[in-house]
């Protein structure tokens, strides 16, 4: 059984409340999800193909990520999820926060810059089926093919706010 902390809309932890994966999140409460875009120091981005058995199966995604466990910070969750799904680590920068009322989720968005060998990506059984590295223009051109673009849009906004649309 996976347990989550409960948060209000402003990402304040609600003490004394524990959420359980698979159970409905009560009105006015949210659970935390961290998503990570991975950029290699050579400028390419990691894409992963979702396992065919998952929701949006066989689609490509530009993020690793998942729900934060009880007691986990957004950054700790991002690091754990990236390591579990890819075997990679690197330097993390928080690039955004997205509240999704329909999912009762708060998405903490991160950019991870890594210098790991690009051939060392380790796929997580049951989660991912393939991976590939693509340049910025290719990433932008694939938006319609991606399972989710939420974190990608946070990345674009982060780049624009820092005067660089290709950070």
Task: List the predicted regions and their residue ranges.
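The catalytic Nudix box helix
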Residues: 46-47, 62-95
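Short, solvent-exposed loop/turn elements at beta->coil junctions and helix N-caps
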Residues: 21-24, 95-100
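Nudix hydrolase/Nudix homology domain
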Residues: 13, 58, 70, 99-167
């Amino acid at each position: 059984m996976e347990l989550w902390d409960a948060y209000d809309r402003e990402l304040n932890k609600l003490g004394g409340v524990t959420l359980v994966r698979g159970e409905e999140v009560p009105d006015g409460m949210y659970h935390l999800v961290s998503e990570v875009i991975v950029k290699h120091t050579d400028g390419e981005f990691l894409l992963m193909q979702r396992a065919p058995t998952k929701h949006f199966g066989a689609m490509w995604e530009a993020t690793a990520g998942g729900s934060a466990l009880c007691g986990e910070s957004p950054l700790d969750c991002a690091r754990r999820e990236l390591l579990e799904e890819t075997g990679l680590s690197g330097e993390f920068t928080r690039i955004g926060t997205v509240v999704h009322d329909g999912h009762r989720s708060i998405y903490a968005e991160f950019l991870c810059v890594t210098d790991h060998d690009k051939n060392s990506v380790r796929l997580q059984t049951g989660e991912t089926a393939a991976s590939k590295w693509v340049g910025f223009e290719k990433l932008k051109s694939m938006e319609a093919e991606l399972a989710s673009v939420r974190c990608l849009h946070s990345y674009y906004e982060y780049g624009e706010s820092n005067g660089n649309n290709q950070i």
